[in-house]
Amino acid sequence: MALTSSAESPVPVREVARQIGLWVGRLGRIWVDGQLTQIKIRPGTNTVFFNLRDPSANVTLLATCPRQVFECIEPKPTEGLRVAVLGKPEFYVPRGSLQLVVHDIRPIGIGDLLARLERLKKILAAEGLFAPERKRPLPFLPRVVGLICGRGSAAERDVVENARRRWPAVRFDIAAVAVQGPYAVPEIVAALRRLDDDPVVDVIVIARGGGSVEDLLPFSDETLLRAVAACRTPVVSAIGHETDTPLLDFVADVAASTPTDAARRIVPDVAEQYAQLAQLGDRLRNALRHRIDREQQVLDTLRSRPVLAHPVQDINRRGEEILRLVRAGRTALDTAIRAADADARHLVARLRALAPAATLERGYAIVLDPAGRVIRGADEVQTGDELVVRLGRGRLRVTVTDVAPAETDHPLGSLA
């Protein structure tokens, strides 16, 4: 029966809530098909809280179940398990919330959601998108960090604040996008391509806080994964908590366990860098001090030698040796000069003995014709020729009165 109301006579909230509760209560117990997500078992309580997700639509229903019923399920319930539950919808009037009170749970097969993701994971792995050799190293100090995250989200604060705490001068280009729902993937892909085309962006971080399996589905979407694989800029995945592992973690160049962990990976710690510089300075000073000490030891060793204890004595000894060598050199040179002089005199004497003048001194003569040519035989002159006779001392001009051939030579006396 419809409630009667008007602007002048509105229905109180409590009445509306009560009527909703009555309508919901009329549904009675029903079997519901869905996937288990966001399971919460609180210690010390007998109630298990979880969500039932429609496998074909983005619709979720809060459900509760007695702990003993939940723990009797075989196989052990996990995120994404496809089940059929017997429950009664109840509307909690004080909070105005709807939940399904479950009395029985029956698994109807492995969760389609996880199975689909597993199939996609195998396909991408076979294509080599997870290969370690595809992973690019992060820059030591990026000029600009591209950050893709929800607008004003905790993930944004975690990355920005922790990164600036480590390196205050770090710059960010933040792209605010939807991080769940039907618009998440296209917005993330568009932001990714814009940042990848920016030449000053040296690394891109995709960050989101924790959530249910269905909340994190965009980060296992094939379109997004292939866009990340095609990026030229290194990409860091920082999705959820440490236990969350979307497929983006396998494709990204670096998989950070949390947004805070991503901040630690993308920039160095300025305090650590100062400490390393100080350590390097200490090592350099120690190395120089060690080198100086070693050279000082070498110098002290050299100074301790006797030759350096009294260096003048060695110089004097060397000087005396040089003087001795000079004297020996002079003596040897004088001896060599005297021997050379004697040899020269002997050679001069021999040359003089062999010279024509010496031969003439011994009584020989040289006969020349008027032209100065030497007459060597009687057949070179005729009777009446005038000749010049060169003696050891002086010359004679003579006239040939007789010519005798060699075979009929007459004694000198007969010529006269």
Swiss-Prot record:
It is found in: Cytoplasm. Its EC number is 3.1.11.6. Pfam families: Exonuc_VII_L, tRNA_anti_2. GO terms for cellular component: cytoplasm; exodeoxyribonuclease VII complex. Keywords: Cytoplasm, Exonuclease, Hydrolase, Nuclease. GO terms for molecular function: exodeoxyribonuclease VII activity; nucleic acid binding. GO terms for biological process: DNA catabolic process. The keyword Nuclease applies. Transmembrane segments: none annotated. The keyword DNA-binding does not apply. It comes from the Bacteria. It catalyses: Exonucleolytic cleavage in either 5'- to 3'- or 3'- to 5'-direction to yield nucleoside 5'-phosphates. HAMAP family: Exonuc_7_L. Heterooligomer composed of large and small subunits. Belongs to the XseA family. PANTHER family: EXODEOXYRIBONUCLEASE 7 LARGE SUBUNIT. Bidirectionally degrades single-stranded DNA into large acid-insoluble oligonucleotides, which are then degraded further into small acid-soluble oligonucleotides. This is Exodeoxyribonuclease 7 large subunit. It comes from Acidothermus cellulolyticus (strain ATCC 43068 / DSM 8971 / 11B). The lineage of its organism: Bacteria, Bacillati, Actinomycetota, Actinomycetes, Acidothermales. The gene is xseA.
